[in-house]
């Protein structure tokens, strides 16, 4: 269940702010709960944020319009990096905020 997964692997949240054309307005913000409070985690979150930024900036306008597809791809990017570094699969929540 999600509760057990969160208990054993933690939770990672990403907040992405886009304009109505899909351009990033600010740097993606990542926070974790119950994974690691180490410098390694801080560096990992920064690195993942940069990867998300690079990925979104490489998309065309129509690819950034579908929030569900974008969330799934970003979730895969996050999980891949966290699994490599920490050998866990946290619950990942992605919030996409659109600003006019």
PLM region spans:
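Acidic/His-rich, metal-assisted hydrolase cores and their charged scaffolds
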Residues: 1-100
């Amino acid at each position: 269940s999600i509760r057990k997964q969160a208990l054993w692997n933690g939770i990672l949240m990403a907040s992405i702010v886009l304009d109505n054309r899909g351009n990033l307005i600010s740097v993606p913000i990542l926070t974790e709960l119950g994974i690691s409070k180490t410098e390694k985690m801080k560096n990992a979150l920064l690195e993942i944020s940069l990867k998300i930024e690079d990925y979104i900036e490489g998309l065309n306008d129509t690819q950034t319009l579908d929030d569900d597809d974008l969330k799934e791809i970003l979730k895969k990017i996050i999980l891949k990096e966290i699994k490599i570094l920490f050998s866990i699969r946290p619950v990942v929540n992605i919030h996409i905020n659109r600003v006019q």
